Structure formats: C-alpha cells, structure tokens
C-alpha cells in the first residue's frame, strides 16, 4: 500500500460457516455500506451448510469443505490456517475480524503482522475452567484466546455477563463492547394477515434445551387450531432429535399440527415465514451449567427476530428474560419443562388475540427504535474510526 492511501479492507475468519451467524451478516453489511471491502474465509458446517449471505457487491464469502472431528480435522485446520495466511498476503486487509475460539490461533499469528489490526467477536464462550480432564487442544485454544483478547484492538461479546467474565478470565485491558444480536432495521416486517390456524413459530438449532419435548405435549393440550412450525437444523450432538419430536407428536395424535420447514438459505425467507405466525418461542432451561445458556439475553437472536416480524413472545421464567421481554409487555413467561405451564400461556394468547397482536406491535416498534443491529453496531464503527484506517 502506498503511504496515505486509505485501506478499507476487512477480513472475517471463522472455522465454520459464517452465514450461520446473523450478526456477522448484519455487521459486514453495515461495514460494506460504509465503504469497506469485506471478505469472509470460513468452512462448511454440518446442519448449517446450506445457509448463505445475501449478495452484496462489497461482500465476498469463500469456504473450505466441512471436515468432521478426528485427526483429519487437525490437518484440515492446518490447511485453513495456511489458506488464511495466503489471503492476508494476497489481499492485504487492514482489519482481521476473528469469530469464536477456533479462530484464535490464526488471529494470534496475524496479530504479529505489521499494520494489521484485530477485532475478536466471541459468539459462544467456552464453559468452565480448565482441569486435568481438559484435552491438550482445548488447553491450547483457551490459552491462545487469552492472548488474542490481550492483543486485539477491540473485543465484542453479545451479553454483559459474558463480557464481564471474558475480561476477568482473559485479563484483557482492551476495549470490550457488548453488542446484542439484534436484526437489521431493514428486516422489520409487518405481520401477515392471520390464517385460520393459530401459529407458533420456532427457528434455530433444534436441540432439547431450545425446543423441549414439553412443547409437543403442551400442543396436545391446546385446541386443534394451534399449530407449531419449526425452521432450523439439527446439531452434531443431537442428531435424530427432529425424528424424536415427530414420533412423539404422532404418538399424541397431533403429528399433523407439527411442521418442520428445514433450513432456509437466506434470512429473508426465514423471516417471511416467521411473519405468518402469531407467537414466537424463545425458551431456555431454567437450570443449566452452560455459561452461554445462563447468559443469553441479548445473545439470543430469536426473540428479536420474532419481534421484528410482529410476533408476541413466549420466554422462560428467568429473571433477566422477564425483565427484558415480559415486563415491557412483549410477551409471557413459562416453565419450559412443564407442559401445563406452556399450555396455559399459549391458551391465553389464543383467547386474547387483540392483546397478543398489540405485544407484537410494541415489540416491533422497539426493534425499529433501539433493538436493531445498526444501533448496536455503531460503537464498533466508532471504535474502528477512532483507531483509523489510514496506512
């Protein structure tokens, strides 16, 4: 680069499919609309392999094929590292935007490159502390995570509790921002006219913690006009769970009221389907040892997406969730493990259509005014501007 020339290139790296992460889609698009050239380097992903970013002239995505766990994956990661280094030398980005722990070894190497600056965005935090049972690779990645946190120009986490834990565990003195996983304001939709059915909607990874069997049992307790539509994918750890849900629904005689829509390639299609529903399900277990499940307000994009489509919310009876979504009047709370508790709240929605619709309208207004990614991401833009992009 010639002295004085503005370098507006940012390289995103993530050892999975970046298109499975809405905040990356929104953030990269905001940067692209502010003049940045954006390149994503990632891999395929089981379950989320079909997901894609919408096209944008300033955003490009390249991926290696997916490699399952095992010794081949270690070689695959080495290849990924070399591939990223090649693109850094070829493309010469000013900023590296590294996502999650598995990007940290590569980001640590790139932090040694002169004039390259690092942004570290942790979508999912590692659980617990290291002990004798921890693998060598886990210890290595965790230690490198701390190094990246200390070298990065900026760190981003989607929840305040996670951000505080991150600062404490990594001992970083760098700027750490709390950026919620909100939808883009451009994704806000008018709720479609109501059909003859009362539609519940769920989207995301289809796992017991997010879509418990109790939901199916609750559905069986409700009038036949109540149906559940599920969009998303199974994870490696819960292969076969969709079939288990279908089998249970059939056993209860409500198989025709439970629909699996699969994964939509683009978010626009997902949100269009969402806008035809009445209530969005955003449930978390009441008790869990997982730090990510303990601290999901702001980090879970589900409730924000539902509100953007004008849906009322059904969330778990957790203090933070009730304060954020129930107290302002955007939905109701239940015990996600109790079919009777779930059914009681869903029946209230069914019997109070005017109030239910009002919840969705209020929530959509909150998305437009505050809970949108343009607002959430603005401190990141300011931080990048403060640090400069000029060589």
Model-derived features with residue positions:
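N-terminal strand-loop element at the rim of the active site
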Residues: 14-19, 30-76, 161-167, 176-178, ...
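Conserved acidic donor-binding segment of nucleotide-sugar-dependent glycosyltransferases
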Residues: 300, 327-339, 348-354
